[in-house]
Amino acid sequence: MWDSSYMQQVSEGLMTGKVPIDQVFGANPLEKLYKRRKPKGTVGLQCSPCLMSKATSTDDIIWDQLIVKRTLADLLIPINRQISDIQSTLSEVTTRVHEIERQLHEITPVLKMGRTLEAISKGMSEMLAKYDHLVISTGRTTAPAAAFDAYLNEHGVPPPQPAIFKDLGVAQQACSKGTMVKNATTDAADKMSKVLELSEETFSKPNLSAKDLALLLFTHLPGNNTPFHILAQVLSKIAYKSGKSGAFLDAFHQILSEGENAQAALTRLSRTFDAFLGVVPPVIRVKNFQTVPRPSQKSLRAVPPNPTIDKGWVCVYSSEQGETRALKI
């Protein structure tokens, strides 16, 4: 029980300063009931080991969770960045695919037109090759022949168009003696003397010279002085000597019409055309191998025991030093 008189005395003593505070608390009758735990030095209030262990384990769990969250955040940041990059890349790829599709739709008619033009070009080249050796007229009664004579009589020289008539005044004038004939007239007469008679055989297979045949083949080949240009010259010469230049040209155009290019056509003919089977390639003498056309130098090989054209050996180069190299396709 509280003692009211004692508490009043204590209050008055504390108010007047007569009673020190330590003395009051030291003489407190409730000291046994209220034991104050004083901290030792600067150490704070201490908890029991059980509470301390619980607090420590809770802090560790919270700290581990915080570390896990930070680790996940660090992992998700680059993943999000990569996903955004992938999305942007996919959008760009989609845009490009749509652009390519649009361009393909625009190119399709151009490709069809290109095939048509290629077919027309092949037909025209074949027609021109035959037209150069075609006799349109064998007499002087046609209107073109009369016009030719009229132009010749008026100007003294043949017209600038090709002279493709056999029996015209220009030929007689070129062959007559005692007359001054200009160079143009002489050239026209020489050309007419080489024109063949019109027949089924000469129309389908004109007897081209080796030079003319090679020039026709060159128009289909890209570049200059390539191994295929040399192959065209060799094949043209062999076909002309065997009398099969017209058949060779027809076979060449036939392969072109099948969709093959000129290089493939020449390679195929060198292996299948009867005039080239088992033929030994010609020998070409050069000062040294540096004088061989540069595009063909990489195709020079050692000469095999029995080279033939149908096995891909075009020609054999022989230098002044006695060395030999074969051109291989």
Swiss-Prot record:
Residues 204-329 form the VP35 IID domain. It comes from the Viruses. Changing residue 31 to K: In strain: pp3/guinea pig lethal and pp4/guinea pig nonlethal. It is found in: Virion; Host cytoplasm. Signal peptide: none annotated. GO terms for cellular component: host cell cytoplasm; viral nucleocapsid. InterPro entries: Filo_VP35 (IPR002953), VP35_IID (IPR031163), VP35_IID_b-sht (IPR043061), VP35_IID_hlx (IPR043060). Residues 70-120 form a coiled coil. Keywords: Coiled coil, Host cytoplasm, Transcription, Viral RNA replication, Virion. Homooligomer. Homomultimerization via the coiled coil domain is a prerequisite for binding to L. Found in a trimeric complex in which VP35 bridges L and the nucleoprotein. Interacts with NP. Disrupts innate immune signaling in infected host cell. Belongs to the filoviridae polymerase cofactor VP35 family. Plays an essential role in viral RNA synthesis and also a role in suppressing innate immune signaling. This is Polymerase cofactor VP35.
